[in-house]
Amino acid sequence: MFAQQPRSAPAPFYEKVKQAISEKIHSGVWRPHDRIPSEAELVAQFGFSRMTINRALRELTDEGLLVRLQGVGTFVAEPKGQSALFEVRSIAAEIVARHHQHRCEVLLLEETRADHIQATALSVPEGTRIFHSLMVHYENEVPVQIEDRCVNAAVVPDYLHQDYTATTPHDYLSLIAPLTEGEHIVEAVQATAEECALLHIHAHDPCLLIRRRTWSTTHIVSHARLLFPGSRYRLQGRFGS
């Protein structure tokens, strides 16, 4: 008489949903940036509870297969882009190199007086006349970076007069004040409520922050605060002797 083999436990319902969605993505039925059915439609399709469907979508988002945009829907994620950590490149150039479309939305472009933090970043006296810009960069209409930049007005006097929907601050600054030195500080941060809204992410979604300072000869040209959603971007650097 043979011993009866124990039966393996059936997969949880949310795992079945995850597997079905993953198969559609990996087989190419659903391609990057395709909008997938809504939670209500998936509930009707699978016959599972909304809580089960929500868990499946949440885990697939955490795994990088889906992107959920509040008030818009859930989309198939693009494979994560890479940003050069040690090489200073334009975000537009990185996106175009992946054969994707770049778009920039300019939120703020102003002349102001440097506060303590800005003055320290640019190594100028507090109250010095500077330029300040704030913009969001999109890759195939998905927000991938908030660029918050302050610029030394004495070094780049025409900064405010450029069309940054046609060129990037990086490209313009590289032309006017060629880069001779750069500094990167990278950290994991939690975005503010305003930043979450701009990036279409949830309150506790992880983000990567690069604080970048660039020099031309002996002058600090600009200090940029570059915020990336962690689920849509990764940094890659290479160095050697």
UniProtKB/Swiss-Prot annotation:
Gene Ontology MF terms: DNA binding; DNA-binding transcription factor activity
Keywords (A to Z) from UniProt: DNA-binding, Histidine metabolism, Repressor, Transcription, Transcription regulation
Signal sequence region: none
Residue ranges the UniProt entry marks as DNA-binding: 39-58
One GO term (biological process): L-histidine catabolic process to glutamate and formate
Disulphide bridges, residue numbers: none
InterPro entries for this protein: Bact_HTH_transcr_reg, Chorismate_lyase_/UTRA_dom_sf, His_ut_repres, Tscrpt_reg_HTH_GntR, UTRA, WH-like_DNA-bd_sf, WH_DNA-bd_sf
SUPFAM superfamilies: Chorismate lyase-like, Winged helix' DNA-binding domain
Residue span(s) of domain HTH gntR-type: 11-79
Pathway(s) where this gene product acts: Amino-acid degradation; L-histidine degradation into L-glutamate [regulation]
Pfam families: GntR, UTRA
Top-rank taxon, per record: Bacteria
Function of the protein: Repressor which binds to the hutP region in the histidine utilization (hut) operon. It blocks the expression of all the hut genes in the absence of inducer.
The protein's name: Histidine utilization repressor
Species annotation: Klebsiella aerogenes
